[in-house]
Swiss-Prot record:
This is Death domain-containing protein 1. The gene is DTHD1. Residues 167-301, 302-483 form the ZU5 domain. It comes from the Eukaryota. Residues 679-764 form the Death domain. CDD domains: Death_PIDD. PANTHER family: BA1-643, DEATH DOMAIN-CONTAINING PROTEIN 1.
């Protein structure tokens, strides 16, 4: 759990100092503000005032002594304000930093008095870390700086002087893939010379490791780095990140999450949610940052912080007026900071869990899940009373609204799939009735006890739908269950664990669609079940559609990664070049995870018995433990797929017609007059036969079907050539001394063409050559 803290403020004001007794002999007085880096790895800034004296002729020790004894009419005032909000458990502290810019005024050496003028700029710095650090204050010291240090520092500082007022805003673009165009990654407001050194990249492949429990990613994940590692960035700089939040409510808030290279995170509260930024018309989360790293915008549970003093506190939650807390006087021995989060429970989830297991039947309803944080070093001296809403039965109206897939004000999500909704409805909607055995049960989570436990006799009913809870010890989170009859504590703990897991999960499915104009292009999406119909309509408008049907429904958590493996005779590529890879989809509820791929067959001669190529997309869940983070490329996934796939999608690809480029046909004409006559007669006969006659003749002649198919394939558009080919093939298959004319005449009579048989006999006997309609190239034997 991380804190959002307001930046600490450190101000320094330095009044002008007038050197009254220094003669104007070309001396130059410079008062400079320098930043010295601390040792031991701690980040702290010290403001050093350095008085430099430079004489044109010489600098003597006597002059230094004279100047030190000079009465200065002025003073240096330093004020520091620091507010530290800290949990002893979390050990989250704030470091104060101060960066001051200097201005050097040229002094005329011809005048007798020299005035040094310093202009200081106050800045604010806040840094929240995961490890405890000692708070370091800003101090002012006076020291001597060697000539070497001056020569190396002054050019840098002069550059800062030159550009300190040249604040600009730059739009950073990045290209996610070869298919999509560039999109806005962020806007950075900083001095122009700094903007030239900053680089911004979109690293959405890291989102699995960025998002946490009860968080929903609503923007790209970006990383901002400085190309010149030795360049000092004048923090703070402004960053605006575009985001799109579809679901907002009283219980959720928009925060900017900042992670370092080790994925240690902190949160920043946006100072504005702008509707317009440059050419981008969407919404941007604007923050001031004091370090570079990995940035993202997340929707998380809203945190409410308040301080409980020795006098106690009575507070009504701003998120839900039905929830209030009463800390009696003396509950703590000293003031402590308390943080509260409220997570509403969807009645449909309770109904679904009851339908899944009969042991949960006694659960009628629940209160919201309360996350509360107290310092463990301050135990309760007196019981703390909380008032929570807890309806005595599941609200039929609330359940109906979830059926219609409408977003509740609490920003909960309908995760009930249509396949089991009927059973859920029957198991959940019952008439409310009074039962003497009805009871209320409090279940709390204590980290030191490693889990949930049941607490007895701490819940009381105030009025219908409202209960009071007395806490005698620290609980990280708790929930009140309204039971129709008593249940064993082990069953209650199992129910709460299942409910907590269901609140972190969403029912979703995989949608696979082919582009209608180009079946080799597919779109693969992970879609929440409640959005399925709308997504299918949108795909249809984009020109995608067709089989297969969406996959079966499964449970997936925010940021969970799905591995898509192509098997069978079809593989895919994201750029049309590299085929045979596996691809990943990262599920984010408020974003639209989508892959557009090019597919083709592995073996063009495969699936020969089918009119299309066949393959399968096998989908696996990838646990976070198997993901190796890498900023520069996609996440490396360990190849141990011991678990079963969550779903499979059949993939089909129509076979394309093969264009065979054949050379021009040539016929060998024999010089033997008998063979030449036979060839002429067979060609004449092929021209005289119709398609029906040819089919009948081919069936009567002793020819194999494969031979006829091969002849048709060679000449698909010329019937005469087909008939001539199989007649020649039949003639060659006969023995040499066979009476071919008599056999052919017999087959012609069988198909009812006795006229052609008689004319064939006449032409053979009289050696009549018929002029062919098509000329052939003659190849020498």
């Amino acid at each position: 759990m991380h804190d959002e803290c307001t930046p600490q403020q450190t101000m320094s004001s330095i009044q002008d100092t007038k050197a009254a007794d220094i003669a104007a002999r070309g001396e130059l007085n410079v008062i400079e503000t320098a930043t010295v880096s601390p040792t031991n790895g701690e980040e702290s800034h010290y403001t050093n005032q350095v008085q430099l004296e430079k004489n044109k002729t010489h600098m003597s020790s006597a002059l230094v002594e004279k100047e030190n004894n000079t009465s200065l009419n002025g003073r240096v005032l330093g004020q520091e304000e620091s507010q530290n909000k800290m949990f002893p458990d979390n050990a989250e502290n704030e470091d104060d930093k101060q960066i001051e810019h200097m201005t050097v005024e040229n002094i005329n050496g011809n005048r007798e008095e020299t005035h040094g003028i310093i202009q200081t700029t106050e800045t604010e710095i806040q840094e929240t870390s995961e490890s405890p650090r000692e708070e370091m204050t800003t101090s002012s010291i006076i020291c001597d700086i060697s000539k070497k240090y001056i020569n190396s520092t002054l050019p840098n500082d002069s550059e800062n002087i030159k550009h300190k007022n040249n604040i600009m805003e730059k739009e950073y673009l990045d290209v996610l893939s070869d298919v999509t165009g560039p999109q806005v990654s962020c806007y950075i407001t900083a001095p122009s010379y700094v903007l030239q050194q900053l680089e911004c990249r979109i690293i959405n492949h890291m989102s699995s490791l960025i998002v946490g429990d009860n968080e929903e990613l609503v923007s790209n994940v970006i990383t901002i780095e400085c190309s010149d590692k030795e360049k000092r960035v004048p923090f703070p700089i402004g960053i605006a990140i575009p985001f799109t939040a579809r679901y907002r409510g009283n219980y959720r808030d928009i925060m900017v999450k900042v992670c370092d290279i080790n994925l240690q995170s902190s949160y920043l509260n946006p100072n504005s949610l702008e509707g317009m930024k440059g050419g981008y018309k969407g919404t941007c989360a604007s923050v001031k940052v004091y370090k570079l790293g990995i940035f993202s915008v997340v929707s998380c549970l809203k945190k409410e912080s308040f301080t409980v003093t020795k006098k106690g506190l009575a507070l009504k939650s701003s998120m839900d007026s039905r929830i209030s807390l009463n800390y009696p006087p003396g509950v703590f021995t000293s003031p402590v900071l308390v943080q509260l989060k409220i997570q509403p429970v969807d009645p449909a989830l309770v109904a679904h869990l009851k339908a899944q297991q009969d042991t949960f039947y006694s659960v009628q309803s629940t209160s919201p899940l309360i996350h509360i944080q107290h310092p463990s070093t301050y135990p309760f001296q007196k019981p703390v009373t909380l008032f929570l809403p807890c309806s005595p039965y599941l609200d039929k109206n609330n359940l109906g609204s979830e059926i219609d897939h409408k977003r509740r004000a609490s920003a909960t999500i309908n995760r009930i799939t249509p396949s089991y909704f009927n059973r859920t409805k029957i198991a959940s909607i019952r008439k409310p009735r009074k039962n003497a055995s009805e009871c209320l049960k409090l279940l709390g989570f204590r980290s030191q006890d490693s889990g949930w436990c049941g607490l007895d006799d701490v819940v009381k009913t105030i009025q219908s739908g409202l209960v009071s809870v007395e806490l005698y010890e620290h609980l990280e989170r708790f929930i009140v269950l309204h039971l129709s009859s008593t249940m064993d504590n082990s069953h209650l703990v199992t129910f709460v664990k299942s409910l907590e897991e269901a609140m972190l999960s969403t029912t979703a499915c995989i949608v696979l669609s082919h582009q209608k104009d180009n079946p080799h292009r597919i779109a693969v999406l992970v879609v929440p079940s409640k959005d399925l119909s709308q997504v299918l309509k949108d795909l249809h408008l984009e020109g995608f559609g067709g089989p297969p049907e969406p996959s079966r429904h499964f449970q997936v958590r925010e940021g969970e990664q799905l591995l898509l493996r192509f098997t069978g005779n079809i593989f895919a590529s994201s750029n049309g070049k590299d085929y045979g890879k596996d691809y990943t989809l990262i599920f984010h509820l408020q974003r639209k995870p989508r892959l557009e791929l090019q597919i083709k067959e592995v073996d063009e001669f495969g699936n020969y018995s089918c009119p299309h190529y066949k393959g399968t997309i096998v989908v696996y869940k990838v646990p976070k433990g198997k993901i190796v983070p890498n900023l520069n490329q996609s996440l490396v996934i360990n190849e141990n797929h011991s678990q079963l796939p969550i779903c499979k999608l059949p993939l089909k690809l129509p076979k394309h017609k093969k264009l065979i480029n054949r050379p021009q046909s040539t016929k060998r004409v024999s010089k033997d007059p008998v063979e030449a006559l036979w060839d002429n007669l067979l060609h004449w006969l092929a021209e005289e036969l119709s398609e029906e006659n040819a089919e009948s003749l081919s069936s009567t002649l002793p020819l194999r079907r494969s031979t006829i198919q091969l002849i048709k394939l060679k000449n698909p558009d010329d019937l005469t050539e087909q008939i001539h080919e199989f007649l020649c093939f039949w003639k060659k298959s006969l023995p040499t001394f066979t009476d071919k004319l008599r056999l052919l005449a017999r087959h012609l009579r069988k198909i009812g063409r006795s006229d052609l048989a008689e004319e064939l006999k006449f032409k053979w006997e009289n050696k009549v050559f018929t002029e062919p309609q098509q000329c052939f190239d003659v190849a020498p034997e």
